[in-house]
Regions:
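Conserved N-terminal phosphate-binding loop of PLP-dependent enzymes in the Aspartate aminotransferase
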Residues: 3-194
Length: 194
C-alpha cells in the first residue's frame, strides 16, 4: 500500500476507491480500504448505503472538496429525502447493532469454515479469500450448477468469473446461519467431485 501512495504522489494522481460493494461495514470495517492502511482522495458508495433504496455518495478529502465550485458536481435526484432518511436509518442500525463487529467475527468464522470445507474437497476448491462478509471460494469447475443446486436447498449464493462462488450475506448473519450454509454445501459438493 505504501508504494501505491508513493506512486500517486509522484505522478500527482488521485486515488479513487469504489466502496459500492465493500463499504458500509461489510468487511468488518466501515470501508474496505481501511484494512490496507491507505487514504483515498475519493470514495464512492451506493448499494448498502440505504438498505436497498437507490442512493449513491461521492466522498472526498477536504483538500479536494475545496476545489469544487457550484455546478461542478450535481445530480438531478440528489438529496432525495426518502433515500437520505433510509441512509440515515442504515447508518444508525450499523452502529446500534454492532454490525461491523458481527461482520468481522462471523466473517472470520465463515472463512474458517469454508477453508475447512476446502480440505474436504481439495480437487474442487482451490482457494477461499475475502474479508468479513465479502468472501469468494474459487473452484476448479464452473459454479453455475452448484449455485442452482444450493438454491434448490434454500441457499442463495452467486457465481462470478465462471468459477468463483461469492458469499455476500446480510450483516446480521449468525454463526448458526453459517453452519447451515456449510451443511448445504456439504450436501451439494460431492456430486461435483470427479
Amino acid at each position: 500500500a505504501a508504494s501505491d501512495v508513493y506512486k500517486r504522489q509522484q505522478h500527482d494522481a488521485l486515488l479513487i476507491i469504489d466502496e459500492i460493494q465493500a463499504g458500509m461495514g461489510r468487511t468488518g470495517k466501515f470501508f474496505g480500504y481501511e484494512h490496507f492502511g491507505i487514504q483515498p482522495d475519493i470514495v464512492t458508495l451506493a448499494k448498502g448505503l440505504a438498505g436497498g433504496v437507490p442512493i449513491g455518495a461521492f466522498l472526498s478529502t477536504k483538500k479536494l472538496a475545496n476545489t469544487f465550485h457550484a455546478g461542478d458536481h450535481g445530480s438531478t435526484f440528489g438529496g432525495n429525502p426518502l433515500a437520505c432518511a433510509a441512509a440515515n436509518a442504515v447508518l444508525t442500525a450499523i452502529k446500534a447493532g454492532n454490525l461491523m463487529d458481527n461482520a468481522a467475527t462471523v466473517g472470520d468464522y465463515l472463512i474458517t469454515q469454508l477453508k475447512t470445507l476446502q480440505q474436504s474437497f481439495p480437487t474442487l476448491i482451490t482457494e477461499v479469500r475475502g474479508k468479513g462478509l465479502l468472501v469468494g471460494m474459487e473452484l476448479t469447475k464452473p459454479g453455475r450448477d452448484i449455485v442452482n443446486d444450493c438454491l434448490a436447498k434454500g441457499l442463495i449464493i452467486n457465481c462470478t468469473a465462471g468459477n468463483v462462488l461469492r458469499f455476500v450475506p446480510p450483516l446480521i448473519i449468525t454463526k448458526d446461519n453459517v453452519d447451515t450454509l456449510i451443511a448445504i454445501l456439504n450436501e451439494v459438493l460431492p456430486k461435483y467431485i470427479d
